[in-house]
Amino acid sequence: TLNDYELRQLDVKTAYLNGPLEEEIYMVAPPGVGAPYWRLRKGLYGLRQAGRQWYLTLHETYSSLKYTCCESDWSIYTCNIGDDVTISATSVDDILLVTNSKTASDIATDELRKKFTITDGGDAQWLLGCRISRWRNNRILKIDQEFFLVRILREFGMEFCNSTVTPCPKWRLMTDMCPKSDDDRRTVASLPYCAIVGKCMYLSTCTRPDISYAVRELARFMSNYGQQHFDAAKHLLRYLQRTRSRGLVYSRIPNTFPMFRTFADSDWAMSEGRRSVSGYIIECAGAPIAWSSKQQGIVALSSCEAEYLACAHCTRQIVWTRSLFREMGFNQANPTTLFCDNKGTVSCTHDPHSHSQMKHIDIWAHYICDCVNKRSIDVHHIPGVDNPADLLTKPLAKVIHSKWLTRLRLYAGQGGVSSAEVA
């Protein structure tokens, strides 16, 4: 979106059959064939080695074509020859080519077609269940999962349900709601709780940061859920029914803007076990590209400590993201700004030694101070009402939740940046 690059989708037919096997493996021959047993020379779907051998074959192919594997993500390869820039991202047999020109895209496709049997999908419109919509004249790209979401609603009989405006119910999910007896467990055993949570988890990972907190709460009870937990899962589906056309909208940003904007936040001891919830958001091209809602591993003794741990959690993702973008050719000369709404935390990241209330924190959390000193990141204060990571730390009221949907550019319809639909 930032550079108006070409997006092209390729599919490798019977990908696993391309990988030669290193182990000696035999199979029973089909009936009617003379030899009773066959030795496998290449992989088959279902073999434990098949996926690994396919990756090694693909890696050798890219290496022979002068591509470089990104150490930050081994599924991404880059190739810069002359003025042509090619980035290839692979998930099993799906390949997404990102190039700076159609000529470079055609060259990369032809080179891969000489090695494998490939279906050329043209301009990328679908990838791993995500719909990609582009308005190239306006430098706008939208990613959504509306069709996948509709299938989820149909599967669980919620396609025409009454909708809700927030993903979380009014009640908090507690262990007291878990079944107390074998009869209670048998009553809820047939409920599709795990299936709902698993499918919603994929949504929250790909395109829907607004449901990350709700999914995380539901996932805590996957092995021991009760009726109220299931009601909360259906509440989430009712919210998704209302917002099913929403997706992340990216657009070109002014050159004066930094490539990344990051936000970290935390509640404080609001959960049942008094462990706080960390949330972070990393934005690029105006919308989130990475986010997380995660319960902290220890009980924070103050809100400052809880926010400090949240910032440390975010810092690790920032460092990885900067490294990945650098390997893809988008180097960041300036430190990435991390916004936090706790002034004490901001002060601690710049001078941790002068704060006695932080001396007991485990050493891993002080990694953020090292990154500040190395100028990889720079932590700044932001008012809590302007911190979108708040969405990932606790249930919010309708008005505040809707505000963050707009702020994160989770838009409905055709993805018009200027006219956002607010639930």
Summary of predicted features, one role per range:
Residues K13-W38, L56, N80-I81, F160-M177, ...:
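Reverse-transcriptase-like RNA-dependent polymerase core
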Residues G121-L248, P383, L391-T393:
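C-terminal reverse transcriptase regions that engage the nucleic-acid substrate
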Residues D11, M27, G46, L58, ...:
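Mobile genetic element proteins and their domesticated derivatives, centered on retroelements
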Residues R131, F221, P258-M259, K294-A423:
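RNase H-like nuclease module associated with reverse transcription
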Residues T1-T117:
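Metal/cofactor- and membrane transport-associated sequence elements
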Residues T1-Y5, R238-A264, F330:
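Structured nucleic-acid-interacting core domains from mobile-element enzymes and related host factors
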Residues C200, T262-C304:
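RNase H-like nuclease fold core
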Residues L56-L97, A104-D106, K115-A124, L203-A214, ...:
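Active-site palm subdomain of RNA-directed nucleic acid polymerases
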